[in-house]
Regions:
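Short linear motifs at secondary-structure transitions and domain/linker junctions
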Residues: 14-17, 31-33, 49-53, 59-61, ...
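Cys/His-rich short segments
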Residues: 26-78
Length: 211
């Protein structure tokens, strides 16, 4: 007979094939949305599922609530053959690998302005030549991640935001570890910088795309 067990949602990060993991984590995002919007914020009436779209509707006053989706940027900052990578503080993020600078977009900000602000806040650096890469839904934090490349603009001395990061540094292409799980836009950005393209990464490492 089948055996089932309760697992943290982080287990989706290591699940294959990736389309099943995506379906599972998207379902948890929808569940989280519905659990947090049971009652209308305007009149207090019990909400109902919309019959026409992915939303909750109040049958009393007509208030409509949509799933929370917060835009955030993630940026691979380079200085020649070096890439800036960091590690999160344990209490702030369960991910223990090398990370790129990332953060949520604030009200009134463009994506580019968010990049400049987040980079200055977290590592005290300036960047230029910001270039869009691609986007990815990231249901773990109700986020739409927008990926970019950027180049260092000025001195490379890092001023660490210690309440967010435990460390940050510049790493030559040859020092960047190969990714073993290509399920995030951050992994793609690092491998595109290291190898020049995802295709080259797959060719050199023999990594099998498990989408």
């Amino acid at each position: 007979s089948d055996v089932y067990e309760l697992c943290p949602t982080a287990a989706y990060r290591k699940m294959h094939p990736m389309y099943q993991a995506f379906a599972g984590i998207t379902a948890t995002q929808i569940h989280r949305f519905k659990e947090s919007r049971k009652y209308c914020g305007c009149c207090g009436h019990l909400m109902e599922n919309s019959k026409t779209e992915r939303a909750l509707v109040c049958p009393e006053c007509g208030q409509t609530e949509y799933p929370k989706i917060s835009p955030a940027v993630i940026v691979a900052i380079s200085d020649g053959d070096r890439l800036l990578m960091s590690r999160y503080r344990v209490n702030n993020n369960p991910y223990r690998g090398y990370a790129l600078i990332a953060g949520f977009v604030e009200i009134g900000e463009s994506f580019e302005e968010t990049i400049h602000r987040e980079v200055m806040e977290e590592v005290g650096l300036k960047v230029k030549n910001i270039r869009y890469y691609k986007s990815q839904p990231w249901a773990f934090s109700d986020t739409e991640m927008i990926g970019f490349f950027a180049e260092l603009d000025g001195p490379d001395k890092i001023k660490l935001q210690e309440d967010e990061l435990s460390e940050a540094g510049w790493y030559h292409r040859d020092e960047i570890p190969d990714e073993t799980m290509m399920n995030s836009i951050g992994s793609e950005l690092k491998m595109v910088f290291k190898y020049g393209s995802l295709e080259k990464f797959y060719e050199v490492t023999g990594y099998k795309d498990q989408n």
